[in-house]
């Protein structure tokens, strides 16, 4: 009787270990898939900030042709067709 109980307990323990190992393997596969998904969409999350560490960006009230030329927190504004300048875009901190 004692050996039968011991064999049953050992059998249950081995089944537990096998199912646990299978679950861990499935989790690692899911983590790999999630990592690949994040890498695929990572480019969408990273945005290039305008004017950060960019040589020659136009300062406040400097002449410009488009917003990409202005430094951070500035945009290219025009009041006449020939008068374009960098103006504050009313933002603070990091974008």
UniProtKB/Swiss-Prot annotation:
Keyword Lyase: no
Signal peptide boundaries: 1-21
Cellular component terms per the entry's GO annotation: extracellular region
Keywords annotated in UniProt: Disulfide bond, Ion channel impairing toxin, Knottin, Secreted, Signal, Toxin
Keyword Secreted belongs to the record: yes
Tissue: Expressed by the venom gland.
Propeptide span(s): 22-50
A matching Pfam family: Toxin_12
Cysteines joined through disulfide linkages: 57-71, 64-76, 70-86
Compartments (UniProt record): Secreted
InterPro entries listed in its UniProt record: Huwentoxin-1
Recorded GO MF terms: ion channel inhibitor activity; toxin activity
Entry text on domains: The presence of a 'disulfide through disulfide knot' structurally defines this protein as a knottin.
Family to which this protein belongs: Belongs to the neurotoxin 10 (Hwtx-1) family. 26 (ICK-1) subfamily.
Function, as annotated: Ion channel inhibitor.
Protein name, per record: U8-barytoxin-Tl1a
Organism: Trittame loki
